[in-house]
UniProtKB/Swiss-Prot annotation:
GO terms for biological process: capsule polysaccharide biosynthetic process. Signal peptide: none annotated. Its EC number is 2.4.-.-. It comes from Staphylococcus aureus. It holds the Pfam family Glyco_transf_4. It comes from the Bacteria. One of its GO terms (molecular function) is glycosyltransferase activity. The lineage of its organism: Bacteria, Bacillati, Bacillota, Bacilli, Bacillales. The gene is capH. This is Capsular polysaccharide biosynthesis glycosyltransferase CapH. The keyword Transmembrane helix does not apply.
Length: 355
């Protein structure tokens, strides 16, 4: 049986981690999976992974001993495939994997850019070196979206190594006969700066003051962050507590998407936005920011997508028009993000002897 080791910083409930766990569930009988957490820390998904029979190894990539321990681990477990998801630090992972004679070395980019390098010249220089190492020592380089494919390594030394594979979702069993609550609004995602939930407070405020319209937005996702605390504080200061309903982190946000009519998504940065895809699959009317990553998804669901610049009044005006039923909405079906397609592509890559 082929042995595959996934590399993550920590197996918390993020999009890349959840989508990877979904593929492992489907392929668990055909491959032996391991996970290496390079933060050296346990994650929120560890218990579930261990219940699936997946071994998790904890090694701190910041420690001097990491390279030696990682190579030793790969050799001891006879790993055939290393599948790394830790952005440009995958360069170090693949160099070490090459040294350990791992046959298939996959680097998988799950975002479209490193937002931290913009103001850090040292990090930018470091990333340039790591990009070259990734190209040389990876046997396959995967991207979560075409935008990521174009942005992250624009000058490709080995074009045949590079491939876009969309995240997969279970869509064949979705029952579309759910009842939507009229004029119900939802946001799904953890509270961090790039998700831009504070923007929605501005939208709520303009709707109230300029359009005489009250809406309530349900927020599903981890709010136990510094940004989440800031969000709650500002909502309280502005007297908007009655306009927000905070659910927090849940195991299955789909139950909330099924009954919600509108999905709001003002992100400033995404890889391939999983929550956005799930919202489309559950026939939500989507109002999203017009970043390229969102556009790549929305192109498959044009009739129910409204892409807007991040201007609060524009969003407020659009919401007012939609709830006044001045626009007729129809929904498109698309299997582009079917998990069975994703799983088949990964299976072929894992089994390939010459990439």
């Amino acid at each position: 049986m082929i042995k595959v080791m996934h590399i993550f910083s920590r197996m918390n409930r993020g999009g890349a981690e959840l989508r990877t766990m979904d593929t492992m569930k489907l392929l668990n009988r055909e491959f032996e999976f391991h996970v290496c957490a390079t933060s050296g820390k346990r994650g929120e998904l560890d218990d579930e992974l261990e219940s699936m029979g997946i071994t998790i190894h904890y090694l701190d990539i910041k420690k001097f001993s990491f390279p030696f321990k990682f190579i030793k681990l790969l050799k001891k477990k006879n790993i055939d495939v290393v599948h790394s998801h830790i952005l440009f630090m995958s360069g170090l992972i693949q160099l070490l994997s090459f040294s350990a004679n791992v046959r298939n070395r996959i680097t998988h980019f799950r975002t479209s850019k490193d937002s931290k390098e913009q103001y850090n010249k040292i990090r930018k220089a470091r990333n340039k070196v790591l990009k070259a190492i990734i190209e040389i020592f990876s046997t396959k380089i995967l991207y979560v979206s075409n935008i990521a494919n174009r942005n992250l390594i624009s000058m490709k030394l080995f074009p045949k190594k590079h491939k876009t594979i969309y995240n997969g979702f279970e869509i064949s069993n979705i029952n579309k006969n759910f009842k939507k609550e009229e004029n119900s609004f939802i946001y799904v995602g953890r509270f961090i700066h790039t998700k831009n939930q504070l923007f929605l407070l501005d939208v709520i405020e303009i709707l109230k003051k300029e359009f005489n319209t009250n809406i309530e937005i349900t927020f599903v996702g981890n709010i136990q962050t510094d940004y989440g605390k800031k969000f709650l504080s500002i909502a309280n200061e502005r007297g908007l507590n009655k306009n927000i309903k905070v659910i927090g982190e849940v195991n299955n946000p789909l139950d909330y998407l099924k009954t919600s009519e509108y999905f709001l998504f003002p992100s400033e940065l995404e890889g391939l936005p999983g929550a956005l895809i799930e919202a489309h699959h559950h026939n939500c009317i989507v109002i999203s920011s017009n970043i390229k990553e969102n556009s790549e998804v929305n192109q498959y669901f044009k009739d129910s997508s409204f892409e807007l610049e991040l201007i609060p009044k524009t969003w407020a005006s659009t919401i007012k028009k939609l709830i006044s039923r001045k626009k007729h909405i129809s929904f498109n079906d698309s299997n582009v993000f079917d998990i069975n397609m994703t799983t088949q592509e990964l299976k072929e890559i894992y089994m390939s002897k010459t990439l």
